[in-house]
Amino acid sequence: MNILPKKSWHVRNKDNVARVRRDEAQAREEEKERERRVLLAQQEARTEFLRKKARQRNSVPELEAADPGAPSSGPVDLFRELLEERKGVPRGNKEHEEEKRREKERQEKALGILTYLGQSAAEAQTQPPWYQLPPGQKDCCPPGPSPDEKIKNRLDPLKEMQKHLAKKRHSSESRPSREERPQKQRPREPPSLEKLRAERLQREAAERARAEALLARVQGQVSQQGQVEAEETDERRRRYNSQFNPQLARRPRQQNPTPAH
């Protein structure tokens, strides 16, 4: 059972819809009345300004036509003549003042200080933001080199050659000159033939002594152990394999053949 539309606070209720429409109509009427008052005030101000201007224009001939010796019934104005003749009033250059005003307005617009009523932030800027520019105009003036230009520069052999030449020039400039280089030590004089011969004889004598000592050690072991045993060819009678101490390996036990019956 759908009872939601039956609620009094429902937005689609007939009473609420009618109330909203009535409020909208009242708001439109109030807006129209406000605009009418603004227009009426502007019209009255313009009319008053024109009336004052007409009075000032007609007051000068009346003063000239009046007798200067006749006493006036109003208060005495000592500065009337100066104001009428525009004397003593500093006059500025209108063009210069207008130019200064435009320059100040341009600076304030560039800084974002001066914004008019109803003007958005994008309109206040001198140049539209990047997200409002069309695709073609975004890429027309990129801040840096484009990807295609980077690839061309990387694959250009002339650019590569210039880079290597610049490195070579830099290394040659950083390398010290011949005068600044430290003088290398002169190589020693080659040894004489007698010295080389003596060294060779000394090495040969040392090798010969080492070989004789080795042979003497082997012969001494043979004399102590006696005659060297002949190498056994039978696999069953050979000693067990011992990599480090073959003399300590024992023979396998000999098996006596069984007599045949």
UniProtKB/Swiss-Prot annotation:
The cross-references to InterPro entries, in alphabetical order and at most eight, read: CIR_N_dom, LENG1-like
Keywords in alphabetical order: Coiled coil, Phosphoprotein
Q: Where is the composition biased (Basic and acidic residues)?
A: 12-38, 78-109, 147-163, 171-211
Q: Which Pfam families match?
A: Cir_N
Q: Does the keyword Coiled coil apply?
A: yes
The coiled-coil regions, if any, are: 16-46, 192-222
What ranges does the record list as Low complexity composition bias?
212-228
- Residue ranges, annotated region (Disordered): 1-261
Residues bearing the modification Phosphoserine: S59, S242
In Swiss-Prot or TrEMBL terms, this protein is called Leukocyte receptor cluster member 1 homolog
Q: Which organism is it from?
A: Mus musculus
